Amino acid sequence: MSDSNDDRPFRPFQSQYRWPGVDLLAYKEEGSAPFRSVTRQVLFSGNGLTGELRYFEVGPGGHSTLERHQHAHGVMILKGRGHAMVGRAVSAVAPYDLVTIPGWSWHQFRAPADEALGFLCMVNAERDKPQLPTEADLAMLRADDAVAAFLDGLAG
């Protein structure tokens, strides 16, 4: 059982980006959406908080789901380097970079083949379900050369 709503005032950082009482979870249910090599940890949830703070780690060569939803995210890169897409903007990301994901923006994170990409993600506790892109959405996104290269894993 995850203690992400654990009321202990201190939980020290452990090696490998782990914290005591916090379960290492699958990013999403297999087959629910396309992604590769991603884990999730819910660090803070409940106990009067209206948001959640989660740590995601994208393994080497992996990527999060390309999705959008009504709610916004705030992200801070903690580990490794990679690339992120928000809307039609693609950027290299590195530790301590901040990424703002407005509502209804297509977004995805990708790790390079040789290292993992880890990040904190702050989000509302109550939120809508993500939407996956349709073929028409993908065609619109791929009309931008930088976005097409990113989606093909060629960014950077």
From Swiss-Prot:
Pathway per its UniProt entry is: Amino-acid biosynthesis; L-methionine biosynthesis via salvage pathway; Metabolic intermediate biosynthesis; 1-deoxy-D-xylulose 5-phosphate biosynthesis
* Statement: the UniProt record of this protein carries the keyword Lipid metabolism: no
Which residue intervals define the domain Cupin type-2 in the entry? 55-122
| Effect of deleting the gene | Mutant does not release methanethiol and does not show an increase in 1-deoxy-D-xylulose 5-phosphate formation after 5'-methylthioadenosine (MTA) feeding. Mutant accumulates a mixture of 1-methylthioxylulose 5-phosphate (MTXu-5P) and 1-methylthioribulose 5-phosphate (MTRu-5P). Inactivation of the gene increases ethylene production from MTA-grown cells.
- Asked if the record carries the keyword Manganese, the reply is yes
**GO terms (BP aspect):** 1-deoxy-D-xylulose 5-phosphate biosynthetic process; L-methionine salvage from methylthioadenosine
Q: What is its EC number?
A: 2.8.4.6
Reactions that this protein is recorded to catalyse: S-methyl-1-thio-D-xylulose 5-phosphate + glutathione = S-(methylsulfanyl)glutathione + 1-deoxy-D-xylulose 5-phosphate; S-(methylsulfanyl)glutathione + AH2 = methanethiol + glutathione + A
Q: Which InterPro entries match?
A: Cupin_2, RmlC-like_jellyroll, RmlC_Cupin_sf
User: What are the GO MF terms of this UniProt record?
Assistant: lyase activity; metal ion binding; transferase activity
> Where does this protein hold Mn(2+)?
E67, H69, H73, H107
EC class: transferase
Q: List the Gene3D superfamilies hit by this protein, alphabetically.
A: Jelly Rolls
A Pfam family of this chain: Cupin_2
Q: What does this protein do?
A: Catalyzes the formation of S-(methylsulfanyl)glutathione and 1-deoxy-D-xylulose 5-phosphate (DXP) from 1-methylthioxylulose 5-phosphate (MTXu-5P). The S-(methylsulfanyl)glutathione is reductively cleaved to relase methanethiol in a second reaction. Involved in the MTA-isoprenoid shunt of the methionine salvage pathway.
What's the protein name? 1-methylthio-D-xylulose 5-phosphate methylsulfurylase
Question: Which species is this record about?
Answer: Rhodospirillum rubrum (strain ATCC 11170 / ATH 1.1.1 / DSM 467 / LMG 4362 / NCIMB 8255 / S1)
